[in-house]
Amino acid sequence: MHLNKKAEVNMPNTYSQLYIQIVFAVKGRACFIKESFREELQKYISGIIAEKKQKLYAIYCMPDHTHIFVSLKPNIAISDLTRDIKANSSTFIKDKKWVNESFSWQEGFGAFSYSHSSLES
């Protein structure tokens, strides 16, 4: 198929079913995420995901890492969403002064796909 530069591909019936668990760690696996602010951090990250128009199913911040379970629309790459979550939440943590030391997330992340049937379990 040949498209000229002015041609636009319109896919009004695009359908996707992408369920992804994203996991990323605090740099050095330091236990910086405290119970005292865990829920507020989770709400903040939830807001980032909602702003990106993705659906959050579950989130849990452990002391040294975070799990996020989302369904992704095809308009965003996993790496872009994760980059935005990590960058914005890192700034949020620093602004709140929740951590006395320099806070940052470890480079990289894990992403694991799930079938629709696994949502119930």
Show which residues each predicted segment covers.
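Basic nucleic-acid-binding interfaces
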Residues: 1-121
